[in-house]
Amino acid sequence: MPIIKSAIERVRTSEKAEARNASQLSQMRTAIKKFDKAKLAGADNLDDLYKAAISAIDRAHSKGLIKANKAARDKSRLSARYAK
């Protein structure tokens, strides 16, 4: 356990950030999975789910949770699945 006050505060803020980041990543993965499930089921709201998944990927990238190449790769694969 840290003893210095600033170190204690830093632990607290890093735990909050870790929870926030995990939540954001989970939201991105969930959006992608929802799109994939809807695609397999042949749902008619595929456009909205596709846009939501792309938006979630972009949001995760802009917040620094995933790197640019991963964002581009995920969006490319999602677009390929959407086109099929």
Swiss-Prot record:
Cellular component GO terms held in the UniProt record: cytosol; small ribosomal subunit
Keywords: Ribonucleoprotein, Ribosomal protein, RNA-binding, rRNA-binding
One biological process term in Gene Ontology: translation
InterPro entries tied to this protein: Ribosomal_bS20, Ribosomal_bS20_sf
Pfam families: Ribosomal_S20p
GO MF annotations in UniProt: small ribosomal subunit rRNA binding; structural constituent of ribosome
Keyword Protein biosynthesis found: no
Protein family: Belongs to the bacterial ribosomal protein bS20 family.
Function: Binds directly to 16S ribosomal RNA.
Protein name: Small ribosomal subunit protein bS20
Organism: Limosilactobacillus reuteri (strain DSM 20016) (Lactobacillus reuteri)
Gene behind this protein: rpsT
